[in-house]
Amino acid sequence: MSFRTLSAILGLLVIQTFSEQNPLTVPTIEPSGINYTRLFSNEMIFTDTWSKDSWNGLTTFAKAPPLRCFGSDAGVLYDVAVLGAPFDIATSYRPGARFGPNGIRQGSRRLGIDRVNVPMKIRATEHIDIVDCGDVPMILVDNKVALRQLELANAALLARPSSHAPEGKSLAKDGKFHPRILTLGGDHTITLPLLRGVAGIYGPVSVIHFDSHLDTWKPRPMEDSPWLPGEEIPITHGNYFYYAHKEGLLGPNNTNIHVGIRGALNRWEDYDDDYEVGFVISHADDLEDIGWKGVVKMIRETVGDNPVYISLDIDVIDPGLAPAPEIGGITTREIKKIFQGLSGLKIVGADVVEVAPAYDTQDEITQIAAANIAWDMLALMAKTPLVA
């Protein structure tokens, strides 16, 4: 036995003997007047003073109140629910987005739902009640079952009444006011069950899709497979809009728009398929040619006065600011300016997807970018009530 090891053992014995002879006690009242019993009680530990620090309390999105939305808190009303969708088994490249909801929440620790969003010129909680419902349990061995779990959970939240009823006629088909859902993904496949939910409440919606890829690819039969002739590739994060179009979930007459497109195509005909699905395209290069104001003009002219769903794939951002496979992307400042230009649109729901913390930098720049974008989405929802 080395001298260092022997010294360490003797040191531990001394510490243990001292602690047994001098047990730690917390005095009720110190000479300074501090009440330690109260200080370490539930009364103080769970007060706002402690929980609002970025390093304290539960890690909900931007310190939103946590709710058991599918359990004991099912009767609590709110205007916007943050919902996690930990799913990544329909990705075509690197998995890891199942950890995205937690990563985005971690990136939001310095934000707060009750803080003033200076660029958006609003304090969201002065207009809407925001809660965090946690994550939907999504099985990781069966795509269909997992997406069905999300669809049912999303529909259950949307069916409830919102906590505020603005003046005017509701956009919803039943004439009632319903909460909105901000979903944290998860690979982009999750947008399909989310669109099913909002379309069930509002009818077809115009989609503003921020992404480097079209995600409207037609599923192709596996003609080259001798074992699966004629079998079709199932729903993935690259073709969910094709299925959304087939199901009648998207706004008609090309009232949907992609923003930030720059990824490679499989064939030139992909553009024709995309137009058939119902999208207008704004490429990433448009930011250089017509600026963010020109892109905003394109978006507003495309979606008109329709109910709008915003879906943002984090790879729309340049990889220098949010590491992802496609170079030449939009900056976070340009995204924020575009969002400012969307004020007044009737946002019925939104998602931020494809955040994979395992591929982020040590500084968590992707998670921080995604969290701030989601925070701006809340501001957009707070700015405009869903009235006709």
Write out the residue ranges for each language-model feature.
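Fungal secretory targeting signals
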Residues: 1-21
